[in-house]
Amino acid sequence: MACNLSPMRKFHPYAVAAEKQGKKIYHLNIGQPDIATPPAYFDAVKNFELPVLEYAASPGMPILIKAVQKYYEDLGIHYEESDILITTGGSEARQMLMLSILDPGSEVIIPEPFYPNYNTFIKSAGGTIRPLTTTPEEGYRYAFREKLEALINENTRAIMFTNPGNPTGVVLTHDELRTIADVAKEHDLFVIGDEVYREFVYGGEKLATIGEFDDISENAVIIDSVSKRFSACGARIGTIITRNKLLQQQLLKFCQARLSVATLDQVASAALYDVDSEYFDAVRREYKLRRDTCYAKLLEIPGVVVTAPQGAFYMMAALPVDNADTFQQWLLTDFDDNGDTVMFAPGEGFYATPGKGRNEIRIAYVLKQADLERAMDLLAIGISKYNETH
């Protein structure tokens, strides 16, 4: 199995070398939120008083499963406790799911650009990605019946997408999700909604979810996580939710093989689900401000093509450069402006189609507004100087 280096992390050695030279790097390459984790998490850890830190149950601790169940009840979606499995982060959820539904040669339809680790999870299960290519000029939208059906063959097992989108920030409408659900139902495919950014939608609308459609309950799978929602990436708590009992049985085998998810992280994460909705209101306002800052600054750079993201905290942008990988390396090794430089995730690694995304980048707007403004200025200066010599 050959897997590519992560576009978010592969330039880390160059960044370390640049920092040793005294350069300050504005990191836009990884979606690590700087928003404070709610105190409820740490309070729950401090108040944990059992005399023995035992293994938790393999499917997850009841206190956390019930918290997740209530969260979806409040959204108007009922799941039984047995429909919910707790995982060690969203990454384990994706890995277990691919191992459960794919055979060697199986294919998963995924709109590209996509979260690069999907490639690793699918390849490790013997499958391949069947990409549905989107473009910045079309706003990276992909829920078109004719395009989806053109990719389906006898090896297709699932349609998988992130909603809101990573790396594009695209938010699917109810009608778009209905289209995907109908295609999945008619062709008996799993439809996998990776909804780890569901709280971060900036138009004021309620996020549509694949869990809304009762007629595809046997096909639908939701992947969720506390990492981004509660700014608790280090907690490593994820969720797989499906009403498909055969799939649940297969997933449970993997849960039992890895024994259990960390007890303390589950206890503390359960407390996060009691956080007041005002927390999310404040976080959304902050991310919307950051999005607007980045988007406005990018529009000022000649030759940049960018669409305002509707959700999550990422945006893709096409740059007037020949190769974003080469450009990023140059920014770290040969460029600075008053000792400052910038780091993003080159776009080619977010595509399965060879050559696609070569001049694109993903920006994670997870810095304070003033830092984002400086980072965008550095990007503009860098593009100008790079194109003078390349």
Segments predicted by a language model, with ranges:
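PLP-dependent enzyme catalytic core of the Aspartate aminotransferase-like
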Residues: H78, E149-A150, W330-M343, F350-H390
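Active-site PLP attachment segment
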Residues: E212-Q250
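Conserved glycine-rich beta-strand-loop-beta hairpin in the small C-terminal domain of fold type I
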Residues: A270, E286-Y295, V306-L319
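Structural signature of PLP-dependent enzymes
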Residues: Q249-C255, Y273-Y295
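N-terminal small-domain helix-loop-helix segment of the aminotransferase-like
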Residues: A2-G89, M96, K147, L272-V275, ...
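Helix C-cap/helix->beta junction micro-motif
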Residues: A18-Q21, A125, E186-H187
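Conserved PLP-anchoring active-site segment centered on the Schiff-base-forming lysine
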Residues: S100-I122
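Active-site phosphate-binding strand-loop segment of PLP-dependent enzymes
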Residues: T135-G203
